[in-house]
């Protein structure tokens, strides 16, 4: 995630707060039901992590994030304030600005799942991947992302001539399908509502 703020007529301190929030509820169904159990949250000098477990299926996922912070395109290493709460973890980073100054935060996120790592290794794996993403850099990651999607479109695109609305609709659905599942792992499947819906708790079943 890359986020920039430019001061128009403000002089003072601007703070950006990259965090994880584990206190998320299901918006569409049973809004009082919590999705995650938080196993552990914390920060290192440069990373924050949130280790979670699903309430229904006992799957564990650890999210890790790190960041880079710029003022007028020059990286600044302002002393961050650590945020360490039971269900929220991250940093607050700030710098003094005057009109015309721009501050930019790039947030690098990695996710490690118990499908692919031993549970005791999830924090280390996610933190390591987040740091690797930061080292790779935003521009390279964006280019790799575009290339990966271009390969998907080259293989799956459907052209509908003379009907822009239908063309947009089919491409939107192809995008949602591949956001949900690409076929790489036979243990996974497509949830009933895809990636954009919360119905059925994400369960997959056959009718």
Q: Model-found features: residue ranges?
A:
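Aromatic-rich carbohydrate-recognition surfaces in CAZymes
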Residues: 201-207
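Acidic/polar, glycine-enriched structural segments that form the non-catalytic walls/loops
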Residues: 1-200
């Amino acid at each position: 995630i890359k986020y920039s703020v430019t001061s128009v007529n403000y002089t003072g301190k601007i703070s950006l707060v990259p965090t994880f929030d584990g206190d998320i509820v299901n918006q569409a169904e049973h809004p009082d039901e919590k999705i995650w159990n938080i196993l552990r949250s914390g920060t290192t000098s440069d990373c924050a992590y949130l280790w979670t477990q699903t309430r229904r299926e006992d799957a564990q996922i650890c999210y890790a994030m790190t960041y880079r912070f710029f003022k007028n395109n020059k990286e600044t290493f302002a002393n961050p304030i650590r945020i360490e709460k039971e269900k929220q973890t991250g940093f607050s980073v700030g710098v003094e600005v005057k009109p015309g100054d721009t501050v930019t935060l790039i947030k690098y996120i990695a996710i490690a799942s118990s499908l692919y790592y031993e549970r005791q290794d999830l924090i280390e794996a996610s933190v390591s991947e987040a740091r690797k993403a930061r080292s790779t850099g935003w521009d390279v990651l964006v280019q790799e992302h575009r290339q990966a999607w271009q390969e998907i479109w080259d293989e799956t695109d459907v052209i509908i001539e003379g009907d822009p609305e239908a063309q947009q609709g089919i491409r939107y659905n192809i995008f949602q399908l591949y956001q949900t599942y690409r076929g790489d792992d036979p243990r996974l499947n497509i949830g009933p509502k895809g990636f954009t819906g919360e119905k059925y708790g994400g369960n997959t079943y056959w009718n």
